[in-house]
């Protein structure tokens, strides 16, 4: 685990604990998702927030103006990050926090690769099968188009890969013929 991820993980876990204590897990989850999207969309704001020439107070004032509508506890957490010069971890903290929420809810993220876009019925069927396989209640599936698969699907859940693509089957046949 990288040092950055380790540091972000500690902050995310602390925030998650506070959210559980105050019954704000879902509120923080939504707001962190929106916050991360805003940070990704507005790189100039991120540069300002990370600018070393700005004082801590200036950064807090900037954050206060931009994040005025978020939960006060979450805003205080952002101030804490600014105080400790950890504001650049905010996006990673949001990811780790969301993973904790997903673990709590029994949800996993999955990337499904196919040659053509899958229908809702196909995605639901895949979700049902692989959620049971992973002992989860639900899968959040992201469907990606990959013409190189030739046919079939490849499902990636965390570090696990389930490859039922025609490309892999042809490669397996080729290996068997050469053996």
From Swiss-Prot:
Molecular function (Gene Ontology), one example: proton-transporting ATP synthase activity, rotational mechanism
Database matches in NCBIfam families: ATP_synt_delta, PRK05758.2-4
Compartment list: Cell membrane
Complexes and interactors: F-type ATPases have 2 components, F(1) - the catalytic core - and F(0) - the membrane proton channel. F(1) has five subunits: alpha(3), beta(3), gamma(1), delta(1), epsilon(1). F(0) has three main subunits: a(1), b(2) and c(10-14). The alpha and beta chains form an alternating ring which encloses part of the gamma chain. F(1) is attached to F(0) by a central stalk formed by the gamma and epsilon chains, while a peripheral stalk is formed by the delta and b chains.
Entry protein name: ATP synthase subunit delta
Main location: membrane
Species of provenance: Listeria welshimeri serovar 6b (strain ATCC 35897 / DSM 20650 / CCUG 15529 / CIP 8149 / NCTC 11857 / SLCC 5334 / V8)
Purpose: F(1)F(0) ATP synthase produces ATP from ADP in the presence of a proton or sodium gradient. F-type ATPases consist of two structural domains, F(1) containing the extramembraneous catalytic core and F(0) containing the membrane proton channel, linked together by a central stalk and a peripheral stalk. During catalysis, ATP synthesis in the catalytic domain of F(1) is coupled via a rotary mechanism of the central stalk subunits to proton translocation. This protein is part of the stalk that links CF(0) to CF(1). It either transmits conformational changes from CF(0) to CF(1) or is implicated in proton conduction.
Membrane topology: Peripheral membrane protein
One Pfam family in the UniProt entry: OSCP
Record's keyword annotation contains DNA-binding: no
InterPro entries hit by this protein: ATP_synth_OSCP/delta_N_sf, ATPase_OSCP/dsu
Transmembrane segment boundaries: none
Residue pairs linked by disulfide bridges in the UniProt entry: none
Keywords noted in UniProt: ATP synthesis, Cell membrane, CF(1), Hydrogen ion transport, Ion transport, Membrane, Transport
Matching SUPFAM superfamilies: N-terminal domain of the delta subunit of the F1F0-ATP synthase
GO cellular component: plasma membrane; proton-transporting ATP synthase complex
Family listed: Belongs to the ATPase delta chain family.
């Amino acid at each position: 685990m990288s040092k950055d991820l380790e540091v972000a993980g500690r902050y995310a876990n602390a925030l998650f604990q506070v959210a559980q204590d105050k019954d704000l897990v879902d509120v923080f989850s939504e707001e962190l998702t929106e916050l991360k999207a805003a940070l990704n969309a507005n790189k100039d704001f991120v540069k300002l927030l990370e600018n070393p020439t700005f004082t801590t107070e200036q950064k807090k004032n900037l954050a206060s103006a931009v994040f005025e509508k978020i939960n006060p506890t979450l805003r205080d957490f952002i101030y804490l990050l600014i105080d400790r010069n950890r504001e650049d971890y905010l996006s990673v903290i949001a990811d780790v926090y969301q993973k904790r929420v997903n673990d709590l809810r029994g949800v996993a993220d999955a990337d499904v690769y196919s040659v053509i876009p899958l229908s809702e019925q196909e995605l639901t069927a895949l979700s049902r099968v692989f959620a049971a396989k992973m002992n989860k209640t639900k899968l959040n599936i992201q469907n990606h188009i990959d013409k190189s698969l030739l046919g079939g699907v490849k499902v990636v859940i965390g570090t696990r890969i389930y490859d039922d693509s025609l490309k892999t089957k042809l490669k397996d046949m080729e290996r068997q013929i050469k053996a």
